C-alpha cells in the first residue's frame, strides 16, 4: 500500500512529529511504500537545520533527513508556512536579502500542490 504523511506539529514540544516519524518507520518496516511527508503549519520546524536537541534526545530533524537519504522519501515543506516561521532555503534567502538559509538538506520547499498530488496518487494519507 502506498502512503503519504502530513505533519502539522513541530519537531519538539508535541508528540505529533515524533509519532509521525515512528509511523513512517513502521510503514517501511512492514513493506509499505511511503512516497512523501508533507510538513504544514508548525510542522515546518522539522526542517530547521539550526535545531539542536540535547545530547540525550533523538535528533528528529536528522532522523527525517536519514529517512529521505535511505528510502527516497520526499520531504516537502509548505513554502508559505515556512517563510512565515523563518525557514528559508538559499534561493528564498537571496530573494529576501537574508544573510543565510536554514533549510535542512533533504527537505524541499513546496506548495500545496505537492500535498494535493500525494492525496491523488497514494492509497492513504495520514495526518499527525
UniProtKB/Swiss-Prot annotation:
Q: Is Phosphoprotein one of the keywords UniProt gives this record?
A: no
Its keywords, alphabetically, are: Cytoplasm, Transferase, tRNA processing
What cellular component terms from Gene Ontology apply here? sulfurtransferase complex
**Which top EC class is named for this enzyme in its record?**
transferase
The EC number of this protein is: 2.8.1.-
InterPro entries per record: DsrEFH-like (IPR027396), Sulphur_relay_DsrE/F-like (IPR003787), Sulphur_relay_TusD/DsrE (IPR017463)
Extract the SUPFAM superfamilies matched here: DsrEFH-like (SSF75169)
Q: Where in the cell is it found?
A: Cytoplasm
Record-linked Gene3D superfamilies: DsrEFH-like (3.40.1260.10)
A Gene Ontology biological process term: tRNA wobble position uridine thiolation
Quaternary arrangement and interactors, per the entry? Heterohexamer, formed by a dimer of trimers. The hexameric TusBCD complex contains 2 copies each of TusB, TusC and TusD. The TusBCD complex interacts with TusE.
Which HAMAP family does the record cross-reference, listed alphabetically? Answer: Thiourid_synth_D (MF_00390)
Function (record text): Part of a sulfur-relay system required for 2-thiolation of 5-methylaminomethyl-2-thiouridine (mnm(5)s(2)U) at tRNA wobble positions. Accepts sulfur from TusA and transfers it in turn to TusE.
Q: What is this protein called?
A: Sulfurtransferase TusD
Q: Which organism is it from?
A: Escherichia coli O17:K52:H18 (strain UMN026 / ExPEC)
